[in-house]
């Protein structure tokens, strides 16, 4: 009898396997009637010390000259992407149709999926923050290192950079961002979890800032921001935010739901900030400023005069 009571007590003390797998965000636990694990209760890797997201103190990030420009392959190709409501976010399936290299990455990486995090408030929808400032949204483009590119056996067995995530902060602007319109318009077709649809034809490049804004970014090693929180991500957080019209941003929380009953609006799908610990954040070096347009015109005559004086 004592043994039976002991086993019952032990099973009651442990969450069930289904409960452990049913993770959620704080807003879901506050709004719904079903039990789920909020971020502070996520277990396993989520309790380790190299987690994401983090606050980036921009003045403490050290310049690394090896962090050069990125090269985007397939990003400019127009596609009819599949987009789905996965119960935690909206996700575009990229299916290895694009890749990245450069940017200080150790190898080429294949694009797997794109998803976003957001709020209905302009100051709490991003996962990462810059100098303590959060933004309205954050877009993650998730890539996986091409197979067979690990430098040694140990790295292949336990890679810390198997996944490369490009993180773009998003703020509210006054103009409609036409590049995001196909995605925003598709949201009406996927209000419930497990629903999917096809977007109007667009390219990944349509979602990105101008090329010059992609030169300034921060880099650190961290984790996935959702369970299983694997610590195998090389993060790139771009300094310059993307701008969307306020109505475009609000469409995500107005049209998407966490539950099939459509009672809990999908918003605040954000993991709290994690400690940086002993890790180092590095940043790309600012490129030199181009010469003012009039200066080259002046340099020609000046050099001619100097040369003439030298030849006398």
UniProtKB/Swiss-Prot annotation:
| UniProt catalytic activity | hydrogencarbonate + H(+) = CO2 + H2O
- In the record, what disease is this protein associated with? Retinitis pigmentosa 17: A retinal dystrophy belonging to the group of pigmentary retinopathies. Retinitis pigmentosa is characterized by retinal pigment deposits visible on fundus examination and primary loss of rod photoreceptor cells followed by secondary loss of cone photoreceptors. Patients typically have night vision blindness and loss of midperipheral visual field. As their condition progresses, they lose their far peripheral visual field and eventually central vision as well.
What subunit structure does UniProt give?
Interacts with SLC4A4.
Positions that bind Zn(2+): 115, 117, 140
Propeptide part(s) removed at maturation, as residue ranges? 285-312
Instruction: Kindly list the biological process annotations in GO that this record carries.
Output: bicarbonate transport
List, for all copies, the residue spans of the domain called Alpha-carbonic anhydrase.
21-285
EC number annotated for this UniProt entry: 4.2.1.1
Species name: Homo sapiens
Which subcellular locations apply to this protein? Answer: Cell membrane
Q: Where is the signal peptide?
A: 1-18
Q: Where is the active site?
A: 88
Its function, per the record, reads: Catalyzes the reversible hydration of carbon dioxide into bicarbonate and protons and thus is essential to maintaining intracellular and extracellular pH. May stimulate the sodium/bicarbonate transporter activity of SLC4A4 that acts in pH homeostasis. It is essential for acid overload removal from the retina and retina epithelium, and acid release in the choriocapillaris in the choroid.
Q: What is this protein called?
A: Carbonic anhydrase 4
Record keywords, A-Z: Cell membrane, Disease variant, Disulfide bond, Glycoprotein, GPI-anchor, Lipoprotein, Lyase, Membrane, Metal-binding, Retinitis pigmentosa, Signal, Zinc
- So which domain of life are we looking at? Eukaryota
Tell me which residues bind substrate: 225-226
Protein's UniProt keywords contain Lipoprotein: yes
Single GO MF descriptor: zinc ion binding
Q: Into which family does the record put it?
A: Belongs to the alpha-carbonic anhydrase family.
Q: How does it sit in the membrane?
A: Lipid-anchor; GPI-anchor
Q: Which positions are lipidated as GPI-anchor amidated serine? A: 284
Gene3D superfamilies cross-referenced by the UniProt entry: Alpha carbonic anhydrase (3.10.200.10)
Q: List the disulfide bonds.
A: 24-36, 46-229
Q: Which cofactor does it need?
A: Zn(2+)
| Activity-regulation annotation | Activated by histamine, L-adrenaline, D-phenylalanine, L- and D-histidine. Inhibited by coumarins, saccharin, sulfonamide derivatives such as acetazolamide and Foscarnet (phosphonoformate trisodium salt).
Any one of the GO CC terms: transport vesicle membrane
């Amino acid at each position: 009898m004592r043994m039976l009571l002991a086993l019952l007590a032990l099973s009651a003390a442990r969450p069930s396997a289904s409960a452990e797998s049913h993770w959620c965000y704080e807003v879901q636990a506050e709004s719904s009637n079903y039990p789920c694990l909020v971020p502070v209760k996520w277990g396993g890797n989520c309790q380790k010390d190299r987690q994401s997201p983090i606050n980036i103190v921009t003045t403490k990030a050290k310049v690394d000259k090896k962090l050069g420009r990125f090269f985007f392959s397939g990003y400019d190709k127009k596609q009819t992407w599949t987009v789905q409501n996965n119960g935690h976010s909206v996700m575009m399936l990229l299916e290895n149709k694009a890749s990245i290299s450069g940017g200080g990455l150790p190898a080429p990486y294949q694009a797997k999926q794109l998803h976003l995090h957001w709020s209905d408030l302009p100051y709490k929808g991003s996962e990462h923050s810059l100098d303590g400032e959060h933004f309205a949204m954050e877009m993650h483009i998730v890539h996986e290192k091409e197979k067979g590119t690990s430098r040694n056996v140990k790295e292949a067995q336990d890679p810390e950079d198997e996944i490369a995530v490009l993180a773009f902060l998003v703020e509210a602007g006054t103009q409609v961002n036409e590049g995001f319109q196909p995605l925003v318009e598709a949201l009406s077709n996927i209000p419930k979890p497990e629903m999917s649809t096809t977007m109007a034809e667009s390219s990944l490049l349509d979602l990105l800032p101008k090329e010059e804004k992609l030169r300034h970014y921060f880099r650190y090693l961290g984790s996935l921001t959702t369970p299983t929180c694997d610590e195998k991500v090389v993060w790139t957080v771009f300094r310059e935010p993307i701008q969307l019209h306020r109505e475009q941003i609000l469409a995500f929380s107005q049209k998407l739901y966490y539950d099939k009953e459509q009672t809990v609006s999908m918003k605040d799908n954000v993991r709290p900030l994690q400690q940086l610990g002993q890790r180092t954040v590095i940043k790309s070096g600012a490129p030199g400023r181009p010469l003012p347009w009039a200066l080259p015109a002046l340099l020609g005559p000046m050099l001619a005069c100097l040369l003439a004086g030298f030849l006398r």
